[in-house]
Amino acid sequence: MQLSEIEREQLYAIVEKYDHHPDVQRMREYIQHGSVTTYQHCKNAALVSFWLNRRLHLHADETSLAVGALLHDFYLYDWHTTGTFHGLRRLFEMHGFSHPGYACVNAKRVFSITRKEQSIIASHMWPLTFRHVPTCREAVIVCLADKYCAVVESMFQRSHAGAVVDGSVDIDGEEW
């Protein structure tokens, strides 16, 4: 799944103002899957979403798609150290269920994102978050891209020495 150099430039032109923000850069501090940081995971999801839209001719709004993908896990905490399962009541407070809400609140607060971008972020964990169903093509694309990236990162991008994979190389082996 590789974007052309021109497509990468187009994608980066959309997300550049978000990418340089200090709070987005904070996502580099947190591990997402295996040894991949949350920042790298979100970048991977943006690249895969853009690729799916272009290659499958899905005609999605590329700005909303790219912004929603980049910010879909903008929750800004280490989910590995928060909470444990203590029965059914606490189930919906666990990270998998709750982080889309935190990410959406943070994105609205920091960037004043659109309703469509909010929908993308809020529904990206469907079907786990069964009440937040993707309602636009951009949300479906990001939801699928997120699942794909999570599998690739968890199975194939694990560090054997505990090093963190981040920043310079994405899921297809190239920079932005």
Which positions does each model-derived feature cover?
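Metal-dependent phosphohydrolase cores
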Residues: 1-176
